[in-house]
Amino acid sequence: MVDGLIVLAHGVLGFGNPLGLPSLVNYFNGVEEHLRQEGHQVFSPQVNPFGSIAQRGAELASAISRVLADGQKTHIIAHSMGGLDARYALVNVPGFVDRVATLVTIGTPHRGSPVADAIVNNTALSAQLPSFLTEQLQRNAGALHDLTTDSCAHFNQTTVESSAIRRIAVPGDASQGGHELILFQVAALIGQLTGEVNDGVVTAGSALREGYTHLDPWPADHAGEIGWSLHSFFPAQLTQRFLPPPTHLAWYDQIVAML
């Protein structure tokens, strides 16, 4: 069992489970329950789904600090924007860095996201995105602006991380994910435009960061990294015949074994 609290930090448009209640829908699909069954202490805080990195990072640090026992440390497993939130908190929230042992970022746009750039600049790529995603981000500009390439470049210059914390970065490779992907069309277009492996939202070059231990790309798109694929929307008796079984829980077990 991991020594310390495992925190699952959600990305933009995401949600937590701060009370730890059973739920039919979780941002990290089935991960919290799976880790609890293995005996780990898990916390899924809620931050503003549309907020800026600064707002979300402060909320993340506050939520974690409220539940940590005296002397206890935490291991943050963050998806997408959640990784930027955690980085902000570690640098800017007084004393928070002393309570964190590990930061794992999964599909985090450390150098920005081509999807955010596309929505801001209204390029052809934005037309390939789900309408609910573009509409929500356009209405809530805090998160959208902070995820652009230019904004993340500034964030990286002003956010100097502590080398005392173990840091792990995981990219996604939608091209290896098979036909159960949700974002396969977007991932293919990003690959054509950038020439990079990507998960349909974040390129591998952006998901990896200097000073972090780099894991091999997960064969999934951005949604699949947290367990959401076509499996999630059809009865098991159908998907088990036509789609490969979901494997994301094993990926999280791999991470937890490193903590």
Regions of interest found by a model, annotated:
Residues 1-74:
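Active-site catalytic motif of lipid deacylating hydrolases and related acyltransferases
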Residues 4, 40, 72, 98-101, ...:
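A structural micro-motif
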Residues 7, 43, 104, 168-170, ...:
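Hydrophobic/aromatic beta-strand patches that form the interior of the parallel beta-sheet core
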Residues 10, 42, 54-159, 199:
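Serine-dependent carboxylesterase/thioesterase catalytic core
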Residues 12-14, 48-50, 83, 109-111, ...:
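Short, solvent-exposed loop/turn segments at secondary-structure junctions
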Residues 19-21, 113-119, 124, 178-183:
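Short aromatic-enriched loop/helix-cap "lid" or pocket-rim segments at secondary-structure transitions
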Residues 162-259:
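C-terminal catalytic-base region of ester-bond hydrolases, centering on the histidine
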